[in-house]
Amino acid sequence: MPWIQLKLNTTGANAEDLSDALMEAGAVSITFQDTHDTPVFEPLPGETRLWGDTDVIGLFDAETDMNDVVAILENHPLLGAGFAHKIEQLEDKDWEREWMDNFHPMRFGERLWICPSWRDVPDENAVNVMLDPGLAFGTGTHPTTSLCLQWLDSLDLTGKTVIDFGCGSGILAIAALKLGAAKAIGIDIDPQAIQASRDNAERNGVSDRLELYLPKDQPEAMKADVVVANILAGPLRELAPLISVLPVSGGLLGLSGILASQAESVCEAYADSFALDPVVEKEEWCRITGRKN
């Protein structure tokens, strides 16, 4: 069915209030969109992370009288009479099909493919991870996830234990298992991430080799041959003493979620414990790898 879209521009601080106002005016759904295409990262549990300059978009039934909607919104203290907005008639589409059509199998390195479940696998002899895109966690489309997947693909993981620190969807741990690791351990602060990782591991037939923990539940003295952490530069610096002890002597470390401008400060936090490789950049992001002293 056709829809009518009303778009408002506001600050991140006011976005939730205007979302409520649009719903009260009859919107059937709300979308937050970055006005300037600035990166935004996965929020903490219970938090909605928004951009400084945010578009709030309300979707209305095609029969809605938008003059009435505008009149209601003009009474909102954040808007007022003559507030700036854009109303657009959307053509009738199969929105779910259009969304699905935007996602294709993606190759990382020489062997690894990440494939949506509704697509045919491009190479049945390759290492294929089946993972559907979702709202909350990584699927390989972000440069930092791509950098980590390419790195894992370049390693001989046969028989190795891998820790995915901040596992999100479990994509890195699952990829490691499919690439030959004997065991993977996923750690995340968000119970939803733990469940997402568990579901994705079952879909890929590796759940029997994946252990998942909240930080408070992880075993003491946990060690691995390979540790990968695709989180943010701030936590990587703050957690360096904890992350640095996870690899065995001679073990490998891979860090991402880091802007290229932040690489030097993250390297400094790990330089005493690791022989670091040259930083690898992709777009404005980078990956730091090294071997435990």
Curated annotation (Swiss-Prot):
Q: Main location per UniProt?
A: cytoplasm
Q: Which Pfam families match?
A: PrmA
Q: Which GO terms describe its cellular component?
A: cytosol
Q: Which InterPro entries match?
A: Ribosomal_L11_MeTrfase_PrmA, Ribosomal_PrmA_MeTrfase, SAM-dependent_MTases_sf
Q: What keywords sit in the KW lines?
A: Cytoplasm, Methyltransferase, S-adenosyl-L-methionine, Transferase
Q: Does the keyword Cytoplasm apply?
A: yes
The chemistry this enzyme catalyses reads: L-lysyl-[protein] + 3 S-adenosyl-L-methionine = N(6),N(6),N(6)-trimethyl-L-lysyl-[protein] + 3 S-adenosyl-L-homocysteine + 3 H(+)
| Enzyme class, first EC level, given as a word | transferase
Its domain of life reads Bacteria
Q: Which Gene3D superfamilies match?
A: Vaccinia Virus protein VP39
One GO MF term: protein-lysine N-methyltransferase activity
Residue positions annotated to bind S-adenosyl-L-methionine are 145, 166, 188, 230
- One GO biological process term: methylation
S-S bridge residues: none
Subcellular location per UniProt equals:
Cytoplasm
Q: What is its EC number?
A: 2.1.1.-
Query: What family does the Swiss-Prot or TrEMBL record give for this protein?
Result: Belongs to the methyltransferase superfamily. PrmA family.
Q: What does this protein do?
A: Methylates ribosomal protein L11.
Name of protein = Ribosomal protein L11 methyltransferase
